[in-house]
Design a protein with these regions (language model features):
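Short glycine-rich phosphate-binding loop at a beta-alpha junction
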Residues: 74-84, 106-109, 238-249
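N-terminal phosphate-binding loop and adjacent alpha-helix
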Residues: 40-90, 179, 184, 192-198, ...
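Active-site rim beta-loop-alpha module in soluble metabolic enzymes
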Residues: 176-237
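Gly/Thr-rich phosphate-binding beta-strand-loop-beta motif of the actin/hexokinase/Hsp70
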Residues: 4, 8-45, 139, 146-169, ...
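Phosphate/pyrophosphate-binding loops at sites that engage ATP/ADP/AMP, CoA/4′-phosphopantetheine
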Residues: 63-77, 98-99, 230-242
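Glycine-rich phosphate-binding/hydrolytic loop that grips phosphoryl groups
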Residues: 262-282
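Phosphate-binding/catalytic loop of phosphoryl-transfer enzymes
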Residues: 107-110, 115-188, 220-230
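Active-site regions of enzymes building and remodeling cell-envelope glycoconjugates
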Residues: 96, 125, 259-266
Length: 282
């Protein structure tokens, strides 16, 4: 998708020239927003700040407007990476409306796999979720030199992906996250209730002494076991010396089963920032 102008930033200017650079990670549950403060910080990764989360399935425009006007007092460009097209389209339309009504120039551009500093060793890279690729791009910069890496992203879905020692994205595994597992049990049976599993990273009791507690135990401990096994399989496939990088909203729930993992909370946004750097000619 090419550049989309919510408001023109003037003739002859590049997509980011002189503008505040904003980032949007549009996921299945949340839209994660941030401002890009530094294209290349000391650790080699961009610095993101002023984080704001919105509900992907419905957010109040006023919340987006307050954040947007607070982080970008002048012209801005927002780089959008999305795995949820309807939410991304609504975000872009709302940004365009805010730009028009407040007379603040805001340009918009989608980030695709071709914008990331990442070689994708798959036949159809355009079909891989941009969130997975963005996380891998960031991980390839922070992993130890000469070693492969396994990236675990704990979101609506869990992804366990592999980056080769030379930085190539090799693919990985995807499984439902705890909320999806709970919803599948509630929707696919006549009597099992919907439960909240792994809320706040708290581990459920085992044995569960009610139906709800038993579901929470099955999901909570089951997903921890699944993640640990997938990481072990990925490390074995890579020769056993892969670094493990952990991110996502409920990452704390699996941290103890991945004791050697390095936790990077905003790994996907950081990867999107790398794509922004390329899009902005940095």
């Amino acid at each position: 998708m090419g550049d989309r102008a919510a408001s023109s930033s003037g003739p002859g200017r590049g997509i980011c020239a002189g503008d505040t650079v904003l980032l949007a990670d549009v996921g299945n549950s949340r839209i994660k927003l941030a401002r890009l403060d530094d294209f290349a910080a000391d650790a080699g990764l961009p610095t993101v700040a002023r984080r704001q989360d919105l509900d992907s399935r419905g957010f109040h425009p006023d919340n987006l407007e307050r954040w947007l006007l607070g982080v970008a007092p002048g012209p801005a460009v927002i780089l959008v990476a999305s795995v949820y097209e309807a939410a991304a389209t609504r975000l872009e339309a709302t940004v365009a409306e805010i730009s028009a009504t407040t007379h603040r120039p805001v340009r918009q551009r989608r980030i695709g796999h071709q914008d990331l500093p990442l070689a994708v060793a798959l036949d159809e890279p355009h079909k891989v979720g941009i969130d997975r690729l963005a996380a891998a791009a960031a991980a390839s910069l922070v992993k130890p030199a000469g070693r492969p890496a396994v990236i675990v992203d704990c979101g609506t879905a869990v992804t366990v992906d592999m980056v080769a020692a030379d930085g190539r994205f090799l693919g990985g595994a995807i499984l439902p996250g705890p909320a999806l597992m709970a919803r599948a049990l509630a929707d696919g049976t006549s009597k099992l209730p919907a439960v909240a599993a792994l809320v706040g990273g708290e581990l459920p009791a085992m044995p569960g002494r009610s139906t709800e507690a038993a579901i929470a135990a099955g999901i909570g401990h089951g997903i921890r076991g699944a993640v640990a096994r997938l990481v072990a399989e990925a490390r074995a496939a890579s020769g056993g010396d892969a670094a493990t990088i952990l991110t996502g909203g409920w990452a704390d729930a699996v941290r103890d089963v991945l004791p050697d993992a390095v936790v990077i909370p905003d790994l996907v946004l950081t990867g999107i920032a790398l794509g922004a750097g390329r899009a902005c000619g940095r």
